[in-house]
Amino acid sequence: PLLSTISILGTAFAITMIMAIVITWQTKYADLEPEVNRSRCLYFSAMHVQGKENKDWNNFGKPSAAFMKECIQPLPEVEACTAFSTADVALVSLTDGNNRLKVDAMSTDPDFWKIFKLQFLDGKSFTEAERGGDMQSVVISASVARKLFGTTEAAGRQMLLNREVVRIIGVVKDISVTAKDAYAQVWSMYHSNELNVTGWWSYNGNRTIAVLARTPDDFPAIKQGVEKRVKDVNAGLEQRQIDIMEQPDNIVAHVNHVWSNIGPNLPMLYLQYGIALFIILLVPSLNLCGLSNSRMQQRVSELGVRKAFGATDGTLVRQILNENLVLTLIGGVVGLIFSYLAVYAMRTWLFTNSDNIGTAGDFSLSMGALFSPAVFVLAFVFCLLINLLSAGLPAWLATRRTIVDSLNDK
C-alpha cells in the first residue's frame, strides 16, 4: 500500500505540472470563446517605417486602420478584418456625473463582432450606420451596466465616456482578461478619419489588426497579397517606406510578439516547451521506475511460477503494465484535479502580460480550456507514457531472468 500510494502521488505530481502547461497553452492559443476564430486568424501588431535613402531613419510602432483598409480589406481571401486598440483606462458615469467608474475601454470597428463572438444580453453590436452620427454608440459589459444602472437592460440609455455623452446600443456578458485581443469593458468606434491616407504617417497608428481567413489554407495567399500591396504602397511613397517585418503572425507568434521592433523566436519557444515537458516526464518516471523495480523484486518468484506454466515474457510484461496502469490512471485523475487548482490559483501570474497589467477585469478561466476533449486525451496519453517509462523497463528486466533464478529468487 505504501509503494502504491507513493506511486499514485508521484504520477499525480507529474500530471499536475504537465497538464498545467497544457491548460495554459489551451487558454492562450486554442479557439475559445470569445476568441473562437484564433485558428483562422492572422495578426498585425507592429509596423516599421524606414527612410528610403537614409536607412538610419526608423520609426517602430503599430499599424493603423488606414493600413488595414489599403492593404488587407481588398484581398478576396479575407472574410473579415478588424483594427482595435489595446483596452485602456477610461472614466464612465451617468449623464448627471454620478456612479463614476474606471473601466477598460477600446475603440474598434463593426467587423470586430464578426471575428470575436461575445454574448449579447441586451441590444446589439454597432454597425457602419452608427459611425459618424450625432452621438457615439458604444457596447458595454454586464458588470459596467449593473454598476451604472443596476440592471443589464441598458440598451438605448446614455452615459458619459470620458465626459462625452454616448449612447449604449448593446450589453455583453463579461469576458476574461485572458482573452488577449477581445477583452474590454467598453467598446466604441474609432473615427472614420483614421481610414484616410494623407501620407506615410497614415500607416503608422496604435492598432492591432486581426484578419479572419476563410480557411487556414488561405494564409499563404493573404500573406502574399499583403506583401504585394505593401510593395505598391512603397512605390508611391517618396521619402519613406513601410515594413511589416514578416507579418502577419499566426496566433502563437502574435501572443509572443511583445516588441514592435523584434519578432518572436518561435523555434526557441517550442524548444522551451519541449524541454520542460521532457524533464517533467523523465524525472518522475525515473523515480517511479525505482519503485516499480522494488515491487518487481518482491514478485520474482511469482513470475517464475507463471513462466513455468507457459507464460511468455511478452504476456507477463503486458500484465504488469496493465496492473501498473490502474495506479497510473488514479494518479492521473488526481493530478488533473490538482492542475485545475494550480492554474486557477496562479491564473493572474500565468496570464498577465504587458497589455493587461492593471486592468479592472477578472482573470477567469474558460470552461472550454479546462474541460475540452483535448485536455482529457492529452492527460490520458501522458499517463500511458509515464506508465510505459516507469513500469516497462523493470517489468522487462524481471521477465528476462530464467525460471530457475526466479524460483530461487536469486
Features from the language model and the residues they span:
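Transmembrane alpha-helical interface segments in multi-pass membrane proteins
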Residues: L2-I6, G10-A14, S301-R347, L378, ...
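Membrane-helix entry/capping segments
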Residues: D232-A276, Q298, M346-V375
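Mid-to-C-terminal secondary-structure elements
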Residues: D109-S125, Q136-I262
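Alpha-helical transmembrane segments of integral membrane proteins
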Residues: P1-A14, I21, E35-R38, L316, ...
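Hydrophobic alpha-helical transmembrane segments of multi-pass inner-membrane transport and secretion
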Residues: P1-Y29, I262-S301, L329, L385
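C-terminal membrane-exit region of the final transmembrane helix in multipass inner-membrane proteins
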Residues: L9, K28, S372-K410
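Transmembrane alpha-helix boundary and packing residues in multipass membrane permease domains
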Residues: M19, I23-Q26, A142, Y340, ...
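Structured, solvent-exposed hinge/loop segments at the ends of secondary-structure elements
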Residues: V22-L148, T152, L161-V166, T348, ...
